[in-house]
Every structure is written in C-alpha cells, then in structure tokens.
C-alpha cells in the first residue's frame, strides 16, 4: 500500500505544479472531504482498510443489570462524526484525523495499545482497529479528483 501511495504522490506532484495555489487549496479541501466520507462509511461498516471486520468488543458480565441492558451498538458511533473527524487541506497537504482527547482514544484503537477504560481502572490492551487508512478505492478517489480538476482547468 505504501508503494501505491508513493507512486500516486510522484504522479500527482507533476500535475499539481500546473495549478495555482488557490486552486490547489480548493482541490485539497474537496479531496479531503471525500476522504473523510470514505473513512466514515468504513467506520460505519466496522471494517479495517484491508477489508477485514473490526474485532468485536469484549463480552461483559451483565448480571445485575436487570432490564437495563442496551442492545449492542456499533463501535465509534460518535467518533466518525464531522465534529470529531476533522479535515484540513491547504495548497501543500491534506490531513484527515482526530484532535484533542478523541485523538488519544483513536490512537489506542488504531495501534492496539494499552489504556485505562475509566479513571482508576486497570490497564487493558485494546484490539487493533484501524480507524484511518487508505484503501485502493481511496487512492482511486484521489486520482479521479485530481484528473477532474485538471480537465476543468
């Protein structure tokens, strides 16, 4: 995947030099928004960038929860909203990611690190669930967006 991304980068660099800074910024924002939509759809489908499903949550002991058991909810329901998943695009780069406290939580899941579920709780190793990453469709989306901008230009 890294070689595909590097090949796309070298191919796009030559074409981007033809655009003015304002046009590059506009293109970066639009591609960034499309990438965010793609990441949101993938999180909603509970899939890693390689197409595998997220590892499900660990089973909890629900004794004593008489009548208060909530149905299973999808993971990262709020995290995938636009208020947490931010896009930044300028003439030289596109960034799709998280900020603040949500970034720390997302990092733990992205790399499968240890963290505390709540204050005072023991450290727990979380399963790796890649929230952000490039799929082949994302690379095609970038390529198509760049070509569309150049044909309009």
What are these regions (language model features)?
Residues 1-153:
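Short, Lys/Arg-rich flexible segments
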């Amino acid at each position: 995947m890294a070689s595909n991304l590097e090949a796309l980068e070298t191919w796009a660099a030559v074409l981007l030099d033809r655009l003015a800074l304002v046009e590059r910024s506009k293109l970066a924002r639009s591609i960034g928004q499309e990438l965010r939509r793609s990441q949101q759809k993938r999180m909603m489908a509970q899939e890693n960038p390689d197409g595998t499903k997220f590892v499900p949550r660990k089973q909890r002991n629900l004794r004593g929860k008489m009548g208060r058991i909530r149905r299973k909810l999808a993971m990262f329901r709020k995290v995938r909203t636009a208020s947490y998943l931010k896009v930044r695009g300028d003439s030289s780069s596109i960034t799709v990611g998280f900020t603040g406290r949500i970034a720390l939580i997302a990092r733990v899941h992205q790399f499968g690190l240890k963290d505390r579920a709540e204050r005072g709780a023991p450290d727990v190793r979380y399963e790796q669930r890649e929230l952000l990453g490039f799929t082949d469709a994302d690379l095609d989306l970038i390529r198509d967006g760049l070509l569309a901008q150049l044909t309009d230009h």
